[in-house]
Amino acid sequence: MLTSYGTSTIVKTTLLCLLMCVVALFIPFIAQVWLIGFAVVFLLFTLYFFRDPERKTPNETAIIVSPADGKVMQIAPCTLPDSGLPATRVSIFMSPFNVHVNRVPISGKVTMVRYVPGKFLMAFDHASMEHNERMEIALDNGQFEVRFSQVSGFIARRIVCTLQPNDVVTIGRRFGMIKFGSRVDMVLPATVRCCVQQGDNVHAGETIIGRY
């Protein structure tokens, strides 16, 4: 299954690869092989990148699931942006080989969707969470607020987010993607018990990040 978030990119890539194959008809044989081979590999990688497998969200209450596929690269204490109360930041690195469709981490009401322009530092550079282009999102489940950010990277410069303020969403629902790698940062209130460790591989909509 392919994600609809990548339709335009898939169409453009397909047309480009077809053009390369046409050009290959008018060049020497060895060059033909290389160009057609490159076109096929490029198209297959694009289709692979925009895959969107089904996910089964745990049938449990009082959980927060991962909004992204990838590896937990940092768990660190922080403070909630508005109140200054203690919180925990969980940072997930998404490589180009991970599934890039993002999913809602907790059921609730969207209280904020804010685009922040910025730089395009490498995603594994922790300065990127504050200085890179990103989409900041807040969800209120009636007990507390969870914040998370889709962060652009050096390669990933296209954020897709379909959430709007006042949307009521359910845990595990698709809401967007970051094209071609990057990171997602979550800020969990201190009342949430973190259930992952640095270095853990996580899957969007399935891996339990925290319990409350």
From Swiss-Prot:
Keyword set includes Coiled coil: no
One GO biological process term: phosphatidylethanolamine biosynthetic process
Pathway: Phospholipid metabolism; phosphatidylethanolamine biosynthesis; phosphatidylethanolamine from CDP-diacylglycerol: step 2/2
Cofactor names: pyruvate
UniProt superkingdom: Bacteria
Keywords: Cell membrane, Decarboxylase, Lipid biosynthesis, Lipid metabolism, Lyase, Membrane, Phospholipid biosynthesis, Phospholipid metabolism, Pyruvate, Zymogen
Localization terms from the record: Cell membrane
Family matches, as InterPro entries: PS_Dcarbxylase (IPR003817), PSD-A (IPR033175)
E.C. no: 4.1.1.65
Post-translational modification as stated in the protein's UniProt record: Is synthesized initially as an inactive proenzyme. Formation of the active enzyme involves a self-maturation process in which the active site pyruvoyl group is generated from an internal serine residue via an autocatalytic post-translational modification. Two non-identical subunits are generated from the proenzyme in this reaction, and the pyruvate is formed at the N-terminus of the alpha chain, which is derived from the carboxyl end of the proenzyme.
Catalytic activity: a 1,2-diacyl-sn-glycero-3-phospho-L-serine + H(+) = a 1,2-diacyl-sn-glycero-3-phosphoethanolamine + CO2
Active site: S182 (schiff-base intermediate with substrate)
GO molecular function, one term: phosphatidylserine decarboxylase activity
Cofactor info, note text: Binds 1 pyruvoyl group covalently per subunit.
An annotated GO cellular component: plasma membrane
Residue positions, PTM Pyruvic acid (Ser): S182
Site (Cleavage (non-hydrolytic)): G181, S182
Membrane topology annotation: Peripheral membrane protein
Function according to Swiss-Prot or TrEMBL: Catalyzes the formation of phosphatidylethanolamine (PtdEtn) from phosphatidylserine (PtdSer).
Subunit structure: Heterodimer of a large membrane-associated beta subunit and a small pyruvoyl-containing alpha subunit.
Family stated for the protein in its record: Belongs to the phosphatidylserine decarboxylase family. PSD-A subfamily.
Family matches, as NCBIfam families: PRK05305.1-2, PRK05305.2-2, PRK05305.2-5
Protein name according to UniProt: Phosphatidylserine decarboxylase proenzyme
Source species taxonomy: Bacteria, Pseudomonadati, Chlorobiota, Chlorobiia, Chlorobiales
Gene this chain is encoded by: psd
